[in-house]
Amino acid sequence: MFDRELEAFGFEKTDDLIKIVPPDLFAELCQQSVQHLQRQRSGVDCQVIFQSFQAAGVLISEDELRKIIRWITTLFSTAAKYNVTCEELLSRLISKLPKQILQVIRHVWNEEGKRLSELEKSRDLLPSGELVDFQWKIGMAVSSDSCRSLNHPYVTIELKVADYSGQITSKVFELTIPEFQNFHKQVKEMSSVLETV
């Protein structure tokens, strides 16, 4: 079952990407992914890690980095789900990954595997999306496609959300004042409902 889940996820496609990642950066990715699975952190901030990769001279796109993060998160959560030993885990990867990467996986699984497996028994290990940060600011439209929008205030909202794999993404959108007031009203309604629970 463990093998089938890994195959269904498409691990074969990510192996080549992982081969170009230096062991120290791979270890950092593993650590952040495990902390996310243990709910010690909201997620893995892909943009910050991507900057580390660029500074280290690793030529990889942000999209490819996201695939690697998903690979790591799925590897450890699936291994925890099936409570595999370190040797079982490595036996499935030994022909596909470099020795240094396997050493990192061995170290992380020996340190955290038991705890992840225990957490898996008590709850679903893959958390749902989580709001990490909420920022807003008021602005004034100084250029517009329609003259009616000129010199009208608007609210810019930035949401940082961690998805199930721990990747943090930013979503930015603008609302007119009436749209923001409606948004505010709906959030207040949610808050009052939560107070009754």
From Swiss-Prot:
It is found in: Nucleus; Cytoplasm. This is COMM domain-containing protein 6. Residues 130-197 form the COMM domain. It comes from the Eukaryota. Belongs to the COMM domain-containing protein 6 family. GO terms for cellular component: cytoplasm; nucleus. It comes from Xenopus tropicalis (Western clawed frog). InterPro entries: COMM, COMMD4/6/7/8. The gene is commd6. It holds the Pfam family COMM_domain. Scaffold protein in the commander complex that is essential for endosomal recycling of transmembrane cargos; the commander complex is composed of the CCC subcomplex and the retriever subcomplex. May modulate activity of cullin-RING E3 ubiquitin ligase (CRL) complexes. Down-regulates activation of NF-kappa-B. Inhibits TNF-induced NFKB1 activation. Keywords: Cytoplasm, Nucleus, Transcription, Transcription regulation, Ubl conjugation pathway. Component of the commander complex consisting of the CCC subcomplex and the retriever subcomplex. Component of the CCC subcomplex.
